A protein has these predicted regions:
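N-terminal FAD-binding dinucleotide-binding subdomain shared by FAD-dependent oxidases/monooxygenases
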Residues: 1-34, 38-39, 43-44, 49-58, ...
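N-terminal Rossmann-fold NAD(P) dinucleotide-binding loop
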Residues: 70
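Aromatic pocket-lining residues of Rossmann-like dinucleotide-binding sites
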Residues: 73-77
Length: 301
């Protein structure tokens, strides 16, 4: 490999950089094509990040997982594949994104400095400050805004009102499933019955409607707590084999494994000590940006 020298090194690897494959029996036996979503194989699927996966037009595809990544992938897969099986253990809460083109007249009306003001308001929102819908108005901030409104009206304890606000939000999301998915049995399987932040909330305007397509089938594996096995030709779930040409793993990333394993590169400080040894008793840094003994090394995420 190449050897490079630099005065400053910035680590922008983030916590989710090592893909995690599920421990499904037989995963190595599959003779079709397979890949993890973060290692998307466009040579096989065709198309690009915005869809148009023409290489799947004659393929039966399975995607395992229905988390935040799958919510983004499923609409394009359903649109392009001959047949799509979506294997779901626990449904995600999928709220409306309501993404739309920016109104040119509105954009022209913005005063100089609006970007900085929006950044300030966004920071305040995440620190628990007041949320101004004129600057930040999305699904992430709506729950907090609704909770604050309830507290102001009643004066009751925050914890009890938080549960009420959360329930109302989730009821709205479950109602969206009923309004969108035509088959009541499929709709029921797609409903999330838990607090909104039990799993990462998702927002998409096309995911739920994808299950109205004739070429898309939701395979609920909640009873068996996941896919049972993978064979040479497909996936076994609920005692049934689903022959497929391609398996896509939307199974997330390693989060709780060691930092050394996730980063995958050795880092030594001025005393010859590795950063992993330095952090054996726990990660510590200055403002989450610099580490004593490792000059000119910056942590950016």
């Amino acid at each position: 490999g190449d050897s490079m020298r630099a005065r400053h090194i910035c680590l922008g690897t983030g916590p989710a950089n090592r893909p995690r494959l599920p421990g499904i029996p037989g995963i190595a036996q599959f003779k079709g094509h397979s890949f993890h979503t973060c290692r998307w194989d466009y040579n096989y699927t065709g198309g690009g990040p915005n869809g148009g996966l023409t290489g799947l037009a004659d393929k039966t595809v399975a995607i395992i997982g229905t988390g935040a990544t799958a919510v983004q992938c499923v609409p394009a897969l359903g649109e392009s594949a001959k047949q799509l099986y979506v294997f779901q253990r626990t449904p995600s809460s999928v709220d409306e994104r309501n993404n739309a083109e920016t109104d040119p007249a509105w954009a022209a009306s913005l005063k100089p400095g609006w970007q900085k003001e929006r950044q300030r308001k966004f920071g305040e929102a995440f620190l628990g400050g007041p949320i101004d819908p004129a600057f930040v108005d999305d699904g992430w901030t709506r729950l907090t805004r609704n909770l604050k409104a309830l507290v102001a009206q009643s004066g009751e304890s925050v914890s009890g009102l938080a549960q009420i606000a959360d329930f109302k939000t989730m009821e709205t999301i479950r109602g969206l499933v009923d309004d969108t998915v035509k088959d009541p049995a499929v709709a029921e399987k797609l409903k999330a019955y838990y607090n909104q932040f039990c799993k990462r909330p998702t927002f998409n305007d096309f995911y739920l409607d994808t299950f109205n397509r004739e070429n898309v089938e939701l395979v609920d594996v909640s009873a068996s707590q996941g896919v049972e096995a993978i064979t040479e030709h497909g996936i076994i779930a609920n005692g049934q084999e689903y022959p497929v040409d391609c398996i896509i793993y939307a199974s997330g990333f390693e989060i709780t494994s060691s930092y050394e394993r996730r980063l995958g590169i050795p880092i030594f400080g001025v005393a010859g000590q590795s950063i992993y040894e330095h952090w054996q008793a726990g990660m510590r840094s200055m403002h989450g940006l610099m580490v004593s003994g490792f000059p000119n090394l910056f942590l950016c995420g």
